[in-house]
Amino acid sequence: MSTKVVEIKTLKVGKYIVLGGEASKITSLTTSSPGKHGAAKARLEAVGIFDNQKRSIVKPVDTKVDIPIIDKRVGQVLSIQGNNVQLMDMENYDTLDLPMPEELKDQITEGIEVDYIVALGNMKIMRTK
């Protein structure tokens, strides 16, 4: 599990965070100061990269949280079997079986190159080249 620890106040919308053991992309981040002696709080909402579930937390801004180290890679589509795509990594020539994303179903064909990500042991095809 490759993660890095940062404080919530350093995060921005569009960055990634680990919530509930899943890598998630931050969709909104608001901070508020509750009063004279209270610490500022951050309300963070995120959507899971791999499962598309919405998650939210409310924590003090100086709380330390994990952010995933996301590895972006390029692969070539070798074959398509139903809802699975067989890819060959263009750097180390490993062969991978990944699920076909619904939004890219009509764009992915054999022989094209795709960008995919690896985070927390999961992999997902992001876009075609």
Curated annotation (Swiss-Prot):
One of its GO terms (cellular component) is cytoplasm. Its main location: cytoplasm. Keywords: Cytoplasm, Hypusine, Initiation factor, Protein biosynthesis. GO terms for molecular function: ribosome binding; RNA binding; translation elongation factor activity; translation initiation factor activity. Pfam families: eIF-5a (PF01287), IF5A-like_N (PF21485). InterPro entries: IF5A-like (IPR001884), IF5A-like_N (IPR048670), NA-bd_OB-fold (IPR012340), Rib_uL2_dom2 (IPR014722), Trans_elong_IF5A_hypusine_site (IPR019769), Transl_elong_IF5A_arc (IPR022847), Transl_elong_IF5A_C (IPR020189), Translation_prot_SH3-like_sf (IPR008991). It is found in: Cytoplasm. Transmembrane segments: none annotated. The modification Hypusine is found at K36. Signal peptide: none annotated. CDD domains: S1_aIF5A. GO terms for biological process: positive regulation of translational elongation; positive regulation of translational termination. Belongs to the eIF-5A family. Functions by promoting the formation of the first peptide bond. NCBIfam families: eIF_5A, PRK03999.1. This is Translation initiation factor 5A. It comes from Methanobrevibacter smithii (strain ATCC 35061 / DSM 861 / OCM 144 / PS). The lineage of its organism: Archaea, Methanobacteriati, Methanobacteriota, Methanomada group, Methanobacteria.
